[in-house]
Amino acid sequence: MRAGPNLGTWALLGDAIRGDGTARRALILVENLSVPFDRRVWQECTTLRDAGWEVHVICPRGEKRDTEPEAVIDGVRIHRYPLRAATGGPAGYLREYGSALWHTVRLARKVGPVDVVHACNPPDLLFLPALWLKRRGARFVFDQHDLVPELYLSRFDRGKDLLYRAVCALERRTYRAADIVLATNESYRDVAVRRGGRQPEDVFVVRSAPQIDRFQPVPPEPELKRGKPHLLCYLGVMGPQDGVDYALRALAKLRDELGRTDWHAVFVGAGDAFDAMVELSRRLGLSEQVQFTGRIPDADLVRYLSTADVCLSPDPRNPLNDVSTMNKVLEYMAMGRPIVSFDLKEARVSAGDAAVYAPANDEAEFARLIALLMDDPEKRIRMGKIGQERISGPLSWQNSQASLLAAYAAACRDHAPVSAATRSAQKRRAVER
């Protein structure tokens, strides 16, 4: 059975369905992932649907999944466009984003009038179609998944150059255009208030949370350990800022400096740095002990996490990572796995005592903490239980549902639905013809 909002949460959106039975309409814009592959966006879609909204999504097509141009999944209407990911530096991003904006406006015209346009970054360019829809009566909810200026500094190592100033300007324009801002954690909320100039009452924290029904442990499979006593697991994106290189160097130190070879490691996921990380593993002499799976089905992911003894969160401290909530940390916690992390502000907020923390970017200490947990099964069990309790309690999606619906209620307060009247007029014109 699908868990929906409780009665108090439903009350926050009392006018989601009009007296004439016409639902308010929301249009969610995404550029960097397909839907429902983007789990946060999909949870938002189904929460709004359960609260009576008619939900549309515009997003790119996936390469291996989410490939249909049009789909209706569990009552959510998804409109997808072809998009080639950027290559070749800034010019590649200009081509990608220009194409995405053109397709987004094209499909938004097809969707028609909406009450809320909900734009998810990156990039901080979706305020452009959002402004176009605002002029047609929509309210604009900005869902800030990433701090793009910090992402730029962390990913490209170019300093505060002209492009950095440009992304800062785009962020400011997005904040100004939005009626309501959704932040993924308190650090992002502080940025929206301090740097974005938003009033605190207009910024709502909607934490990402794993789908509990997707992360149900299964019996461990010792064969996944490739004959070793311990399995170490990394799950997530492999981009330049995600720290897979730190994890690999820590594993080399675990072997070379601590003399530990009683482990097998699996890295699940893909990204821009995937090939470089496979090559780094080879150069470090880890090919026999480290396995890269790429993206795998959920069922296989759960098998690895259920068998893992220690999970790795090697995101280095940088301007973005220190204030970002890492989905992999939450997913490890949902599966009851102990975590080794670098000491980042939001990592501690999320994991608490479900993780042990190495000083920022200290690979030797990261390796030592892996060894410590491998040698202490009782501590691993305690940490795993703490993580599961946090995910089912203060970090649960049910709490985020309430905040999301409160944000939509605030966006629509004193704002008459535009879509019902407009659609009625469209129907009358169709009948007259």
Question: What annotation goes with each model-predicted range?
Answer:
Residues 355-364, 372-378:
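Conserved acidic donor-binding segment of nucleotide-sugar-dependent glycosyltransferases
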Residues 38, 242, 299-304, 313-334, ...:
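Nucleotide-sugar-dependent
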Residues 372, 379-394, 406:
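A short, well-ordered alpha-helix in the C-terminal region of glycosyltransferases
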Residues 46, 105-109, 128, 132-136, ...:
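Membrane-proximal helix-turn-helix segments that form the acceptor-binding/catalytic region
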Residues 27, 182, 224-251, 266:
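Conserved donor-binding/catalytic core segment of Leloir-type glycosyltransferases
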Residues 187, 208-209:
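Carbohydrate-associated surface elements
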Residues 268, 275-302:
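Nucleotide-activated donor-binding/catalytic signature segment of Leloir-type glycosyltransferases, i.e.
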Residues 2-77, 208, 423-433:
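N-terminal subdomain of nucleotide-sugar transferases
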